UniProtKB/Swiss-Prot annotation:
Gene3D superfamilies associated with the record: EF-hand
Name of the protein in question: Uncharacterized calcium-binding protein C50C3.5
Keyword Coiled coil in record: yes
Keywords: Calcium, Coiled coil, Metal-binding, Repeat
Organism field: Caenorhabditis elegans
Superkingdom of source: Eukaryota
SUPFAM superfamilies, alphabetized: EF-hand
Pfam families to which the protein is assigned, alphabetical: EF-hand_7, EF-hand_8
Binding site for Ca(2+) 2: D96, S98, D100, Q102, E107
Amino acid sequence: MPVAKDNQFWDALMENKVAKKLIKKHKCKAKCENIDDLANRYEVSKQEVEKVFKIFQLMDDDGSGTISSSEVAKMLNELGIDVSPKVVQAVMRSSDVSGDGQIDFEEFLAAVTSKIKLSTVKADVQLMLSKIDNNPEKVISAEELVVAWSETVSTNITVKEACALIQQADTQGRGKATIHEFITMCQTV
């Protein structure tokens, strides 16, 4: 499934060991401009912007300032991930916001930071759900979700937002979702 491979690509790319290995392997000379602005806009540290920039440079073999589908394929291969055209298309589709067939640095940074944030949210949600009950078949209501969310996650949600999440997770149309359904829904995001 391309989406899973797309996530596998981003996860492998940002894994500390892989990133460090790739950065050591290639010497990056250019500096990222507007680090402060980008860090603020994408709500990440300056160090994270610099790290992502170095990885971007590694992928930009021709020095064009953009990453092409062939450069994505090459990086997928280096990461040991399936290099089928569908996987490359999934990565390009998830990142190329402008639709020009190339991924510029800001598009790359946006994709990476969204994956980092999503990973954090998923971990928070799983922790939150484990606090509700260890029984994956336990049914939770929107109200229970609001309480558990406020005790675990750094943001609050309203009952209306919780209802929308429950509705999305509820595979049987009963207005409630099991913890298993909720985790499954979170993993498919």
